[in-house]
């Protein structure tokens, strides 16, 4: 006798390749990004900045934004909230944005997380040397390695203060402030969906 299959519902946000390409196109048109992907990223990125665990690199996940950033796990939610709270240092108040545009937490998290990763790419494009290396990212490798041995809020605080991450955070807020209306139009389209999994 076969056991009964257990179907459970899971909330998720589906960031499609078309959606990501439209964001790339927007920032290329605004001359914030150069056309194409900085190849140095493929040399030195072993895992995702925004969501660890991805290993395959292509145009879609070069920003390291996972297909599903929605989570009900308390430790993951705490990390998301810490990231958003930390951006208040640079003038980004996610609670204000949520209220102003009637967006939910994960829409705003998706938005600023993607802008953060675009901040990394802008930095890489501008700091690449004649050999295709990024000095600032190479110098930060030891800090990323050290961060893996930390835990809890100490780890989160240290991570946000790694020079590469600080720069990307600042650029994310700058991009939002500069293109707020257009960026909001992109990310208000994102909805939390329900899917059934066995």
Question: What role is predicted for each listed range?
Answer:
Residues 23-31, 118, 122, 176:
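Hydrophobic, Leu/Ile/Phe/Ala-enriched alpha-helical segments that form helix-helix packing faces
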Residues 1-103, 182, 187, 193-195:
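A metal-dependent hydrolase signature that marks the N-terminal structural subdomain at the beginning
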Residues 16-19, 108-111, 115-118:
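Extended low-polarity, hydrophobic cluster-rich segments
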Residues 87-98, 113-115, 129, 133-135:
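Catalytic phosphate/metal-binding cores of nucleic-acid and nucleotide-processing enzymes, i.e., regions
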Residues 105-109, 124-160, 164:
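Post-HEXXH active-site segment of zinc metalloproteases
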Residues 121-134, 177-186:
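Substrate-binding/catalytic groove segments of enzymes
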Residues 112-125, 168:
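Active-site recognition of the HExxH zinc-binding catalytic motif
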């Amino acid at each position: 006798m076969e056991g009964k299959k257990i179907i459970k519902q899971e909330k998720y946000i589906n960031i499609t390749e078309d959606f990501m390409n439209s964001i790339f196109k927007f920032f290329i048109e605004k001359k914030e990004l150069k056309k194409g992907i900085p190849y140095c990223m493929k040399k030195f990125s072993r895992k995702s900045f925004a969501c660890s665990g991805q290993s395959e690199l292509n145009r879609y996940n070069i920003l390291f934004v996972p297909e599903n950033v929605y989570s009900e796990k308390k430790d993951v939610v705490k990390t998301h909230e810490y990231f958003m709270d930390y951006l208040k240092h640079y003038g980004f108040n996610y609670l204000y944005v949520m209220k102003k545009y009637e967006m939910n937490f994960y829409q705003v998290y998706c938005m600023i997380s993607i802008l953060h990763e675009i901040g990394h790419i802008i930095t890489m494009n501008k700091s690449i040397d004649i050999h295709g290396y990024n000095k600032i990212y190479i110098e930060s490798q030891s800090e990323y390695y050290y961060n893996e041995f930390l835990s809890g809020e100490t780890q989160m605080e240290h991570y946000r203060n790694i020079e590469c991450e600080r720069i990307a955070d600042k650029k994310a807020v700058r991009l939002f402030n500069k293109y707020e209306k257009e960026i909001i139009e992109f990310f208000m389209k994102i909805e939390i969906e329900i899917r059934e999994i066995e």
